[in-house]
A protein has these predicted regions:
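Acidic donor-binding/catalytic loop of UDP-sugar-dependent glycosyltransferases
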Residues: 101-114
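A recurrent flexible, glycine/aromatic-enriched loop bordering the glycosyltransferase active site
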Residues: 157-185
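Glycine-rich, basic loop-to-helix element that forms the pyrophosphate-binding segment
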Residues: 69-86
Length: 305
């Protein structure tokens, strides 16, 4: 085991039992690493039947879990994971993954590599992130079950569009949103940073700015990683933000841009740190090796989906 590191891999679940179980299984399928880790399920839901079935599955599988109080917002669920991690002092780092997403088997291999090379890291965001979709777009790969995968390799040319210096894209007509998935937190983060439950759409985006500004003040160290063979985002699920958006395009629910939440976040940025230096181009980027190429990714996705 990697000396001095102990990882709490927390799966946050609120609905959709089959996706939640899929996520848990991918946490347990990690390969080629030497990290001491525990998979831990946080059940944060208002659906009592789902709560019962999820607890039943965890008991049957021998997986530790905790039921936390839910108000129906994604922020409250994610903050409850922070609270669990804060209580579990034996763990050095937290991985917080939404139960409708899932991991490649090389995820922990990347975490180990990064923390070995950059041990003072407090936050890692993965960008770009592989995703699965209901509808086809140019460049997507069709999977056996009829859905499509948008997969990244080692082409970094698009980073110039996604990682703006100076001013974030939220202040332009072509807001790209926060495309990064926050995949690792050190013990420095919980109890100091929180997801805002008033930011019903874009809570990840808002905490990104809090972390970015803290990085600029030299209070924490926030990295972006190019390791696309880590996390898979499932855009076919029907989560809280899609329910709030209630927007269907080509038969698929999407998270619609919400002007109220967008303007609230812009105002927050202006008051907190100012428009300038709001771009994430100041964050260091770890151009990580790719352990899983496209063909291996497709094979894994066809087996897990």
């Amino acid at each position: 085991m990697k000396e001095g590191l102990k990882i709490l891999m927390s799966v946050l679940v609120s609905s959709d039992l089959s996706r939640a179980i899929r996520c848990i299984k991918t946490c347990l399928l990690q390969t080629e690493h030497n990290l001491d880790f525990q998979t831990y399920v946080v059940i944060n839901t208002q659906d009592k039947e789902f709560e019962r079935k999820m607890a039943e599955y965890c008991n049957w599988s021998g997986i530790d879990y905790e039921i936390t109080e839910s108000d129906g917002t994604a922020s409250t669920g994610k903050n409850s994971v922070f609270e669990v991690f804060h209580k579990k002092k034996e763990f050095t780092h937290l991985i917080q993954i939404d139960g409708d997403d899932f991991l490649y088997p090389t995820f922990l291999r990347h975490i180990e590599r990064h923390l070995t090379k950059y041990p003072n890291t407090d936050v890692i965001g993965i960008l770009p992130c592989d995703s699965i979709y209901m509808n086809y777009e140019e460049g997507f790969h069709k999977l056996n079950n009829g859905i499509y995968a948008g997969l990244w390799g080692t082409n970094y040319s698009s980073w110039y569009d996604w990682i703006p210096f100076e001013v974030d894209s939220i202040f332009s007509d072509k807001c790209t949103g926060n495309l990064a998935r926050l995949m690792l937190f050190s013990r420095s983060i919980p109890n100091k940073f929180f997801y805002d439950k008033e930011q019903v759409i874009g809570e990840d985006y808002k905490i990104h700015f809090d972390l970015l500004f803290a990085h600029q003040r030299d209070e924490i160290t926030y990295w972006l990683s190019s390791a696309s063979d880590t996390w898979v985002r499932d855009t076919t699920s029907f989560g809280v933000q899609k329910q709030e958006s209630n927007c269907v395009v080509d038969g698929e629910y999407i998270i619609r841009r919400n002007d109220e939440f967008q303007e609230r976040l812009k105002s927050y940025i202006e008051k907190t740190n100012g428009v300038y230096r709001s771009g994430s181009g100041e964050l260091p980027i770890d151009f990580a090796p790719l352990y899983m190429g496209v063909e291996r990714k497709i094979s894994f996705l066809n087996n897990i989906l």
